[in-house]
C-alpha cells in the first residue's frame, strides 16, 4: 500500500527556491517539503549522509543525519542502494558548496531495486541496450528523457494548430479489409471469428476521405501506420503520421499550412530556425518550391526536356546509374526513380517538390494543364521526405481505372501495389468535394528538431532484430 504522497517535484523546488541565498532560506525557514524519487548518488559519512534523488522532473540533493531521524531508520538508510525509490520530508537549506538541499526529517523506502543500476548511474552507453531496455535509458540518461518530452510537445503543437484551424480530430480503423491508401507492403493478420485476412493499415487515407463524402470538410488523425518493410535508421515498421484533409482548399494553402505546422513545432520546443541535423546545416526559414521534372534536369545535365517523355531514354539513363528496371514501368516511374537516385538526397533546405507523374500517384488528381502529372507535392528536408500531399482524385471512373492499374501491377508481382477498393469507389460515386490531403511524418519531424540521426532515438520502444 502506498502511504507516501509527495507534495513537491525537484524541478519545482529549484524554480521556486533556486535563487534564494543561504541566508534567505534560513530566514524563510521553508518546512513541509516532501518528495519521492530514485537514489542516483549517495555519500555515506558516518552520522551524516548526502544523496541525490531523481524524480520525473529532475534531481535534488538530500541531507540525512542521525540528529534529525531515528537511529534505526538512519542505519537502514545506510544499507539502501542506488536505484531504490524513497520518499523524504524535511526543510530546505544550502550546503557549504551552495547546493539547494533538503534536510531530511523523515524518510521511507517506497520500492526496493533488486537489480544494480548500469554504469554506476553514469548512463547507459550501449546503444543496443538503450533501445531494448528503454526504461534504463530513461532512468540514467536525462538527454533521452528530454527527447521524449520534446516529442510530446511537438505532437501537442501540431494538434493545437489543427484544432485552431477548425479541423476535427478523428480515429479510423487500424485493421483494413484491403491494403490501400499508400504504395507499401502491408502486414497481414487473420480475424478468427470472421474467418478472413485483415491488413494493418499502411495509411488512413481512404477512410478519412470517406468522411469528406459524409460531410466533414476538415478532418485529421494522428496515429500509427504500419509497413512491412526493412529496418533502418530511417524506417521502423510502425510509425506515427499526422494526416489531414480539407475540402474546397488549394494545394498552395496546404503547402503553407505544412510549413506553419513545422515552424510552430520548432517554436514549441524553443528550437532555432537555423539547425544542425546529422551534420547538415538547415535553415527552416528557407522553404522553396520546385517541379520534380525541373529538379531532374538541374541535377542530371545529360538529360534534356525531350528525354522526360522518352521511356527508352529514361530507362537507358537509369541503367547507367546502376539501377535495375522493370518492363512494366512507364516514363513516370522511370522519372521518379531517377529523382530518388540523383536529386532527393541533395535537397537539404526545406523544398516542396511538385508535379509528380500520375503513374506513381494513384490517388492524386491530374494536373489540368498537364494530365500526365498530378497535383501533388512532397516536402524534403535534409535529403529525406517529410510530407506528401495532393489534390485528391474525386472522379470515381478515373480512380477505378487507376485501381485496375494497381491490381495489374500486383498480379505482376508488385507486393507494394494497392488492392482494388470497390467500397471506396462506391463512396466516390456519392460525390466527394474537391479536397487536398497531406500526410506528415511525426517521427521524422521529431528527429529533425531534436537533432537525432536514427528513428530509434525518437521512438520509446523501436522494433529491433532478435
Where are these regions (language model features)?
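Class II aminoacyl-tRNA synthetase catalytic cores and aaRS-like
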Residues: 1-466
Amino acid at each position: 500500500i502506498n502511504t507516501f504522497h509527495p507534495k513537491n517535484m525537484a524541478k519545482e523546488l529549484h524554480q521556486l527556491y533556486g535563487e534564494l541565498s543561504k541566508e534567505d532560506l534560513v530566514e524563510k525557514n521553508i518546512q513541509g517539503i516532501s518528495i519521492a524519487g530514485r537514489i542516483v548518488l549517495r555519500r555515506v559519512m558516518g552520522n551524516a549522509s548526502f544523496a541525490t534523488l531523481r524524480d520525473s522532473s529532475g534531481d535534488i540533493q538530500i541531507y540525512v543525519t542521525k540528529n534529525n531521524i531515528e537511529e534505526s531508520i538512519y542505519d537502514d538508510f545506510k544499507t539502501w542502494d542506488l536505484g531504490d525509490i524513497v520518499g523524504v520530508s524535511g526543510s530546505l537549506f544550502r550546503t557549504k558548496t551552495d547546493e539547494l538541499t533538503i534536510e531530511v526529517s523523515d524518510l521511507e523506502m517506497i520500492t526496493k531495486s533488486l537489480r544494480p543500476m548500469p554504469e554506476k548511474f553514469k548512463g547507459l552507453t550501449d546503444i543496443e541496450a538503450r533501445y531494448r531496455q528503454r526504461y534504463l535509458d530513461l532512468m540514467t540518461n536525462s538527454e533521452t528523457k528530454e527527447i521524449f518530452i520534446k516529442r510530446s510537445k511537438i505532437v501537442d503543437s501540431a494538434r493545437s494548430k489543427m484544432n485552431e484551424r477548425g479541423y476535427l480530430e478523428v480515429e479510423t480503423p487500424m485493421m483494413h479489409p484491403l491494403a490501400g491508401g499508400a504504395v507499401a507492403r502491408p502486414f497481414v493478420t487473420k480475424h478468427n471469428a470472421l474467418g478472413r485476412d485483415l491488413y494493418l493499415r499502411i495509411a488512413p487515407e481512404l477512410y478519412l476521405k470517406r468522411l469528406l463524402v459524409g460531410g466533414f470538410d476538415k478532418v485529421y488523425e494522428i496515429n500509427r501506420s504500419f509497413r512491412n518493410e526493412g529496418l533502418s535508421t530511417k524506417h521502423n515498421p510502425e510509425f506515427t503520421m499526422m494526416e489531414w484533409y480539407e475540402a474546397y482548399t488549394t494545394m498552395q494553402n496546404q503547402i503553407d499550412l505544412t510549413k506553419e505546422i513545422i515552424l510552430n513545432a520548432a517554436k514549441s520546443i524553443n528550437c532555432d530556425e537555423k539547425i544542425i541535423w546529422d551534420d547538415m546545416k538547415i535553415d527552416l526559414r528557407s522553404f522553396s518550391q520546385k517541379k520534380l521534372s525541373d529538379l531532374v534536369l538541374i541535377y542530371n545535365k545529360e538529360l534534356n526536356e525531350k528525354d522526360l517523355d522518352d521511356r527508352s531514354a529514361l530507362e537507358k539513363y537509369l541503367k547507367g546509374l546502376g539501377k535495375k528496371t522493370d518492363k512494366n514501368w512507364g516514363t513516370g516511374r522511370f522519372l521518379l526513380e531517377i529523382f530518388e537516385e540523383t536529386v532527393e538526397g541533395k535537397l537539404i533546405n526545406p523544398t516542396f517538390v511538385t508535379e509528380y507523374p500520375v503513374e506513381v500517384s494513384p490517388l492524386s488528381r491530374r494536373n489540368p494543364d498537364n494530365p500526365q502529372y498530378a497535383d501533388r507535392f512532397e516536402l524534403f528536408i535534409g535529403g529525406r521526405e517529410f510530407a506528401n500531399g495532393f489534390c485528391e482524385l474525386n472522379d470515381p471512373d478515373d480512380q477505378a481505372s487507376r485501381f485496375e492499374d494497381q491490381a495489374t501491377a500486383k498480379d505482376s508481382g508488385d507486393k507494394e501495389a494497392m488492392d482494388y477498393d470497390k467500397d471506396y469507389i462506391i463512396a466516390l460515386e456519392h460525390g466527394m468535394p474537391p479536397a487536398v490531403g497531406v500526410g506528415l511524418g511525426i517521427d521524422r519531424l521529431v528527429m529533425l528538431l531534436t537533432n537525432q540521426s536514427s528513428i530509434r532515438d525518437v521512438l520509446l520502444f523501436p522494433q529491433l532484430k532478435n
